[in-house]
A protein has these predicted regions:
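Eukaryotic scaffold repeat domains enriched in small/polar residues
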Residues: 1-354
Length: 354
């Protein structure tokens, strides 16, 4: 539904932004989101690989960082710029996975394949990069999610070594926690990560089908969600966000034909509130431009019985909360768009029956 009120909270679908594009105005498998102080959104495009039948011509398509303004309603979105591209040279990306922006506007991007963090300024100029590998690592760690706290400490999840590592912004490792397992505090392929206003760290524990909450030093605090088939369950959570009220938003993959992913919402105590499955009933402005430029495409769209299947999420991978505008941003990965929900306060439910 477009508007849902639960436990004093109202989530109201706003609009969506995006279309499939390997460059420029659009996205290519967006997998991470971050906002800067000016309200611009940095989108990590995982892209794809174009692999010919010869080993020396293996190239990637679409891997980059897009910078966009989402606007307050449909039609106000604006493509601002993009930077980086596929490759292993300094400033380039192969498997970009996470992004965060610090108070100075510096953009930090993790790369699972290269096991490093690349740093850019807000204009996209490359500044530096540093490895997430540490002495004693026996294999690549798969740097995935990244978050930053109020003290400028970076937290990076290692999907292959099942850890969370702490770094300074120049790459000095401050410590780590976690090991492979399913017990309290243990991890199995951690992915998305965030830090709340009180400094607690939340980790999307992908293969354990839960989110875990820690202190900034890695002490286990609580588990949010659990695996299963019930409405409140989690299935392969990929990312997590927390709003100023303490409500927790968990991005999940559900691998079945009728439910290809959703956002599960919990209150600060970990009680399930509701789930969002996507409501993009209208094409984005950019997608409308694509349709308008291709009359055959428009004809075929008018021939389908219903476009309802494309309204919902398809393997959403990232979620972020825009505090300044009190709204939730969801990277609808396989549909190459961002769906946006406003969190409303003092919403008055109409007193009528329809």
């Amino acid at each position: 539904m477009l508007t849902e009120t639960v436990a004093g909270r109202t989530y109201d679908y706003s609009h969506n932004v995006g279309r499939g594009s390997a460059t420029g105005m659009g996205f290519a498998n967006p997998v991470a989101l971050a906002l800067d102080a000016d309200g611009a959104v940095y989108v990590v495009n995982r892209g794809g690989e174009s692999i010919s039948n010869v080993p020396w011509d293996r190239t990637g398509v679409g891997a980059r960082i897009s910078k966009v303004s989402l606007g307050s309603q449909a039609g106000e979105e604006e493509y601002l710029s993009e930077f980086s591209r596929y490759g292993s040279a300094p400033g380039q990306l192969i498997w970009p996975a996470g992004v965060v922006v610090d108070a100075q506007g510096h953009v930090y991007v993790t790369d699972e394949w290269l096991n490093r963090v690349s740093v850019f300024d807000k204009e996209g100029n490359f500044l530096s990069c540093w490895s997430t590998l540490q002495s004693g690592d026996s294999e690549p760690n798969g740097a995935a999610g990244i978050a930053i706290d109020a003290h400028n400490t970076l937290y990076v999840t290692d999907g292959r070594s099942h850890k969370v590592r702490k770094f300074t912004t120049d790459g000095t490792c401050l410590g780590s926690w976690g090991r492979l397992g399913s017990g309290p505090g243990e991890l199995d392929s951690p992915w998305g990560i965030t830090v709340d206003d009180e400094g607690y760290v939340y980790v999307a524990d992908f293969k354990n089908h839960r989110v875990q909450k820690y202190t900034s030093n890695g002490e286990f605090v609580a588990q949010i969600g659990s695996p299963g088939t019930k409405r409140a369950s989690l299935s392969n959570p990929t990312d997590v966000a927390v709003d100023p009220d303490g409500d927790v938003y968990i991005c999940t993959w559900n691998k079945n034909a009728w439910d290809r992913g959703r956002i599960q919402i919990f209150d600060p105590e970990g009680h399930f509130l509701t789930g969002l499955m996507g409501d993009a009933q209208q094409l984005s402005m950019w997608a409308e431009m694509t349709v308008a430029a291709n009359t055959d495409y428009l004809k075929r769209r008018r021939e389908v019985r219903s476009t309802e299947p494309e309204w919902t999420f398809a393997q959403p991978t990232a979620v972020a909360f825009d505090v300044a505008n009190s709204r939730l941003l969801v990277a609808d990965t396989q549909r190459s768009r961002i769906q946006i929900y406003n969190k409303l306060s003092n919403y008055l439910v109409p007193q009528m029956n329809l």
